[in-house]
Amino acid sequence: KRGGAPAGDEPPRAGERLALVLEDEEDVRQTLCEQLHQLGWLTLETASGEEALQLLEASPDIALLISDLMLPGALSGADVIHTARRRFPALPVLLISGQDLRPAQNPALPEVEWLRKPFTRAQLAQALSAAYARI
């Protein structure tokens, strides 16, 4: 079962789940993956929206999608999230960006949990819990 949350809407425990990280800036992606590892997650990472969708199709173990909003290429982070939500409605999603992500400022954004960069590991952990609570 993809993306199912345990009782109490708490994220899975250490080493049990795999997160797909879609971020085009390598240093930001590495830092985010390090924070996820410290929180007990395994990670797959990519800078491409197209590759992220391929990985989601090919890897049923992915239990969380974290995507940057602004990406190079044809697909934005919002495009990837919209497609992923259609294909995998039970997959928790976290949208990250340096931009203001409040819905009033961005009515076209997908209705998912979001986190504004830069963020701390504690803020990331709280956002992950909130992303699981939305499913």
What would you call each of these model-derived segments?
Residues 45-64, 72, 104, 123:
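Acidic, metal-coordinating helix/loop segments flanking the phosphotransfer/catalytic sites
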